Design a protein with these regions (language model features):
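Hydrophobic alpha-helical membrane segments
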Residues: 1-183
């Protein structure tokens, strides 16, 4: 769900900046930017709703709204993003060749596909610049205090078992624990 929050937040932020170039009123561009992030993510969620593999998720929809709301609330309150949501990613290479094969199959072989699909390689960050809350302090403006969350051991949507169209198991790594980790 963190990915939904981050996506809606980021899309809202980019769209508000695009609307800034048009010269429209500050409040209008904040709201249009925020609604753009929410609308874009809602369209994706609607498409998921018609997919037999995914289906509609109220939790995903709520996370989308939270991401856009986080952006809008900060812009309206502070005219800046004091609490920023960020993403880092890298291509994972496993010592077990079967995991590399499975990763190539479900996440893709090239970097853009992997950046989009491989949750094992993501770390989501929430970063706060203390100086923005305490402007008279001697803290450096560049300092950010961050908390990150990532996941490991995910080689399928809901489990580490994959079946072909006939229901035959073609990949079974139920021995690999799926877990979250904090940074």
């Amino acid at each position: 769900k963190v990915g939904h929050v981050l996506s809606a937040y980021s899309i809202s932020k980019v769209n508000m900046e695009l609307w800034r170039w048009t010269g429209i009123d500050r409040n209008k561009r904040i709201w249009i930017g925020g609604m753009s992030g929410a609308a874009y993510q809602t369209v994706i969620e609607l498409l998921d709703g018609f997919s037999s593999e995914w289906g509609w998720s109220w939790a995903d929809f709520g996370a989308n709204m939270l991401g856009s709301s986080t952006f809008v609330a900060q812009e309206l309150a502070w005219n800046e993003q004091r609490i920023q949501l960020k993403l880092s990613s890298h291509k994972k290479i496993y010592s077990d060749e079967s995991l590399n094969f499975r990763s190539d199959k479900i996440f893709g072989k090239n970097v853009p596909e992997r950046l989009l699909k491989d949750y094992n390689a993501y770390t989501y960050w929430i970063s706060v610049a203390p100086k923005s809350f305490f402007p008279k302090s001697k803290l450096p403006a560049w300092l950010q205090v961050s908390l990150g969350i990532g996941a490991e051991g995910m080689f399928g949507a809901r489990s580490n078992i994959a079946k072909d169209k006939f229901g035959n198991i073609i990949f079974d790594r139920s021995d690999i624990q799926r877990y979250r980790q904090w940074y």
